[in-house]
């Protein structure tokens, strides 16, 4: 099941990258609007109609608007969280301090860029 979850994350990352150009032309006013639209469109198999994550997967979100960065943190059954960093057109996924998805090959360790972020838990 863990491999399936990681595969889902990679599919989500690919979907975000592929949809970026389309959404840029779609008239969305802000970066945050565009990001949340993509995440909603690409994660229907993870998130139920009520907005909560299914299958015991907890989804946390932090948006750092001033830096135009969005960090998504997925906690999977007590394992080390997977941190997905979106910066403009660059998307990176890190787990256990190792990059597991980096399409442009530009990040040695994205953890060092995340100096602080607040985790907001769905209730």
Where are these regions (language model features)?
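Short intrinsically disordered terminal tails
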Residues: 1, 121-123
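Active-site nucleophile-adjacent alpha helix/oxyanion-hole segment immediately C-terminal to the catalytic cysteine
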Residues: 1-49
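Conserved active-site-adjacent core of cysteine acyl-enzyme catalytic domains
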Residues: 28, 38-105, 110-115, 121
